[in-house]
Amino acid sequence: MSSSLFSYVVLLIFLFTIPYIQSQPTAPAPTTEKSPINLTAILEAGHQFTTLIQLLNTTQVGFQVSVQLNSSDQGMTIFAPTDNAFNKLKPGTLNSLTYQQQIQLMLYHIIPKYYSLSDLLLASNPVRTQATGQDGGVFGLNFTGQAQSNQVNVSTGVVETRINNALRQQFPLAVYVVDSVLLPEELFGTKTTPTGAPAPKSSTSSSDADSPAADDEHKSAGSSVKRTSLGIVVSFALFCCSVIYIA
């Protein structure tokens, strides 16, 4: 009898506590905040990108990358030339560029979309960069290689280099190491001479004096003078002979 009463009491307690338990708010699941991606920290970890970091800072392109990375759903692909790549440039190459051209050079190393190495081989050349459209230029990159070996080359029309290891290859950012600075054809291509430009003219006196036609004219004039003088001498001699004969 006592055991039945005890069971009945336990059942009542259970029935009364169920509504209370159901009314309690469910604790929210812990949220994982996505930390912003720091491009400078990624490059510093590579230990060979001092010049690139300096250019990204002075041109403010590094700040632009940070903003876009944390606001775009397309991701981004960056090609990072090593310090040795910059050292291979002709002396004064960077200093010869204007501030705007330095910005274009940095933007040329950035594709506004995330690409894995295999994706680059499937991309339609030329692939647009962040510099595309500036000053009406194409500023595109061309990719070739072999999918089997995962080897990819990038060409600008001025230089071609192999894409080496990745400092990062996880959406939304891929950072690939390159051993040459990607020089855009719009800034470093062969400059042609404007058509229709008049050829330089030399002075008339010197050209006339040195030309074969001028020499012929001088010779012709000299011959004419000689023939005239000879005719006068012959005529005078005949005149003298006729006077002597009459006398």
UniProtKB/Swiss-Prot annotation:
Quote the Gene3D superfamilies the UniProt record gives.
Answer: FAS1 domain
Which parts of the sequence belong to the FAS1 domain? 36-182
- Positions with an attached lipid (GPI-anchor amidated glycine) read 222
Biased composition of type Low complexity is found at 192-212
Q: Which residues form a coiled coil?
A: none
Mark which residues the record calls propeptide. 223-247
Superkingdom of the source? Answer: Eukaryota
Cellular compartments per GO CC:
plasma membrane; side of membrane
Provide the glycosylation site positions.
38, 57, 70, 142, 153
Tell me the keywords, alphabetical order. Cell membrane, Glycoprotein, GPI-anchor, Lipoprotein, Membrane, Proteoglycan, Signal
Under Pfam families, the record lists: Fasciclin
Q: Entry's InterPro entries?
A: FAS1_dom_sf (IPR036378), FAS1_domain (IPR000782), FLA_A (IPR045003)
Where are the stretches annotated Disordered?
192-221
Chief location category: membrane
The question of whether Transmembrane helix is a record keyword is answered with no
Q: Where in the cell is it found?
A: Cell membrane
Q: Which PROSITE patterns does this entry report, sorted A to Z?
A: FAS1
| Signal peptide (from-to) | 1-23
Q: Topology relative to the membrane, per the entry?
A: Lipid-anchor; GPI-anchor
Which family does the record claim for this protein? Belongs to the fasciclin-like AGP family.
Q: What does this protein do?
A: May be a cell surface adhesion protein.
Tell me what this protein is called.
Fasciclin-like arabinogalactan protein 6
Record gene name: FLA6
